[in-house]
From Swiss-Prot:
Renumbered zinc finger spans (C4-type): 57-72
Organism in which the protein naturally occurs: Albidiferax ferrireducens (strain ATCC BAA-621 / DSM 15236 / T118)
Protein role: May play a role in DNA repair. It seems to be involved in an RecBC-independent recombinational process of DNA repair. It may act with RecF and RecO.
Residue stretches making up the Toprim domain: 80-175
Family of this protein: Belongs to the RecR family.
Annotated SUPFAM superfamilies: Recombination protein RecR
Name of the protein described by the UniProt record: Recombination protein RecR
Length: 196
C-alpha cells in the first residue's frame, strides 16, 4: 500500500505543473519509474537544488542564484530602458529574440481582482521606485495581452504618466489573448521593435 501511496503522491505533484492533468501526470510518473529511474532521481535532485538555491533578484525580481542577476549587473545593458514583464518566462522569451538590450522588472504576476491579486501583491511600489531612480527614461510595458495583463499595464501607466518617463507598450503584433512565452520569436522581436 505504501508504494501505491507514493505513486499517487508523485502523480499529484506532477499535476501541479501547468497543463498537466491526471492522464499526463500518470504517464510521466509511470515512465520515470518504469523506464528512467536515473532520470527520475536527476529530476528530483534538480528540483531540490533549484528550490533551495534560486531566489529573486534584488533589482528586477527575476530568478537568480545571486543577490543581483547577471542581466542587472551587465554594464552593456541600456539602463535607460526598463521593460516590465509578468514572469521570468516572459523575460526569457524577450531575451531569446536578441532585439532588446535594456533592463527588466519582473512583476511575478499580474493584477487580478477576482483572484484577490492587487498592486501590493505584484510589487508595483518597487517598480515605481525603480522606474523613478533617475536613470530610467523609458518604461516598456510588456505585460501579456490578456484582460489582466491589459489592466496591469493600465495601472502601471497611470502610476507613471506624471513622472516624466516615456511609456511604451509592445506593438499589437502579438496576438490578443496570448502569453509571450508561447509566441514565436519573430513576432516578439517585431512587436518589441515596433512598440509605441
Amino acid at each position: 500500500m505504501a508504494d501505491l501511496n507514493s505513486l499517487d503522491v508523485l502523480i499529484q505533484a506532477l499535476r501541479r505543473l501547468p497543463g498537466v492533468g491526471v492522464k499526463s501526470a500518470s504517464r510521466m510518473a509511470f515512465h520515470l519509474l518504469q523506464h528512467d529511474r536515473p532520470g527520475a532521481l536527476a529530476l528530483s535532485r534538480a528540483l531540490q537544488v533549484a528550490a533551495d538555491q534560486m531566489r529573486h533578484c534584488e533589482r528586477c525580481h527575476t530568478f537568480t542564484q545571486a543577490d543581483i542577476c547577471a542581466t542587472c549587473l551587465d554594464p552593456r545593458r541600456d539602463a535607460s530602458k526598463l521593460c516590465v514583464v509578468e514572469t521570468p518566462a516572459d523575460q526569457s522569451a524577450l531575451e531569446r529574440t536578441g532585439a532588446y538590450h535594456g533592463l527588466y522588472f519582473v512583476l511575478m504576476g499580474k493584477l487580478s481582482p477576482l483572484d484577490g491579486i492587487g498592486p501590493k501583491d505584484i510589487g508595483l511600489k518597487g517598480l515605481f521606485d525603480r522606474a523613478c531612480d533617475g536613470t530610467v527614461q523609458e518604461v516598456i510595458l510588456a505585460t501579456n495581452f490578456t484582460a489582466e495583463g491589459e489592466a496591469t499595464a493600465h495601472v502601471i501607466s497611470e502610476g507613471l504618466k506624471s513622472r516624466g518617463l516615456r511609456l511604451t507598450r509592445l506593438a499589437r503584433g502579438v496576438p490578443v489573448g496570448s502569453e509571450l512565452e508561447y509566441v514565436d520569436l519573430g513576432t516578439i522581436a517585431h512587436a518589441l521593435l515596433d512598440r509605441r
